[in-house]
Amino acid sequence: MSATAPHADPIRQYLETARTQIAKGELRQAAETLNKAQKKSPNDARVFMLAGLMAEKAGNVKGAFEALRKSVALAPTWGPGLLELALLLARQNQFQEAVETAEKVAKLEPKNLLVLAGVVDIAHRAGHAEMAVRHLRRGLELVPGDVQLRRLLAADLEGLGQHAEALDVWNGLIAQDPKDQQALLGRVKTLLAAGKPAQAAADTTTLLELAPGDSVYAYYSALAHGVTPPHQPVELNRHLFDGLAEVYDQHTVRGLRYQLPKIVADKILARYPDKHLNVLDLGCGTGLLGVCLGRIDGFLIGVDVSTKMIEQAHRHRVYDRFHTVNLLDALRETPGDIYEVITALDVFIYTGELGETIPNAHRILLPAGDFYFSCEAAPE
């Protein structure tokens, strides 16, 4: 069976209409359109592929997998069906099969740039920088000089500690466009990671000339000039964690066997076995503490700068409210004597100096309340 008809295609119009309807969120209409297409062509892999995309958009992940696996079964060598399955696997944090499927489709369609983009995205989601670099190099053989591919390659090389090669790529991009802010910032980060802050100073000056007052550029400028700012800018952390939100639990809990939320939750429940308390979870992230606590007889309030992380936490349905603000503002603006427990797990590394944090936490705790926080040990 072929996924695409060689001559007149009796269902092409249906497929195009259904794809548009899915994109607009018109899922009932899309289902009706796909039913019409299937009546004309019962075993067309394209129908099942679109049905999978529709099911995922409707929140039916199981149905999405069933439809996409049916699509692949009908057309095992059809690239688009395989790619959509691989992308779904990656979005659901099933990285091993996602990577295997992505590599398969890359071999089937080595010159397809849409496939290349999907494969690189899967590699990044799975934390496989080496895989991403390999496919980015292949992409640059297909489209030499592509700016976006070079930016991604340089960033991945920097992440792998291959600073010299990363700098070569950044240098080439900046020579081509001296006002390329993404490349300038990339070179700054690479020079800082390579232990050459003084060499990054000129680039931070250029960045601040291009975007005066930018807090992220000002932060890196301070580092390049040998000054450690008291706090990281909120915008920097928001961008970082928005990008990590969908894969955070997979990497921390399953990959790194992260146990701190459970340890703290156990301590809280040991002191409050009836669960009658109010908890303020600062830097709540994807809601791991809430998952370990479960529903409590009181308020569980989550605070995080990342909207995407809060979206993940909301799915657990254990938090009563969320506030998308930074930790310092949350503490400063909260009235006193409200919470039995405040938690701040693995967030102080991002907020920096604690001179304001600890007194404000003490102020809003009830008498005899508990403040659980963690710090990282570092070499002298």
Where are the language model's segments positioned?
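Structural signature of tandem alpha-helical TPR/SEL1-like repeats
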Residues: 23-33, 58-70, 92-104, 126-138, ...
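Class I SAM-dependent methyltransferase SAM/SAH-binding core
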Residues: 280, 286-331
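A short acidic, Gly/Pro-enriched loop at the edge of an enzyme's catalytic core
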Residues: 332-342
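A short SAM/SAH-binding and catalytic strip from SAM-dependent methyltransferases
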Residues: 340-354
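A short glycine-rich, Lys/Arg-flanked "PGG" loop and its adjoining helix->strand segment in the class I
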Residues: 355-367
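Conserved beta-strand signature within the Rossmann-like core of class I S-adenosyl-L-methionine
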Residues: 368-375
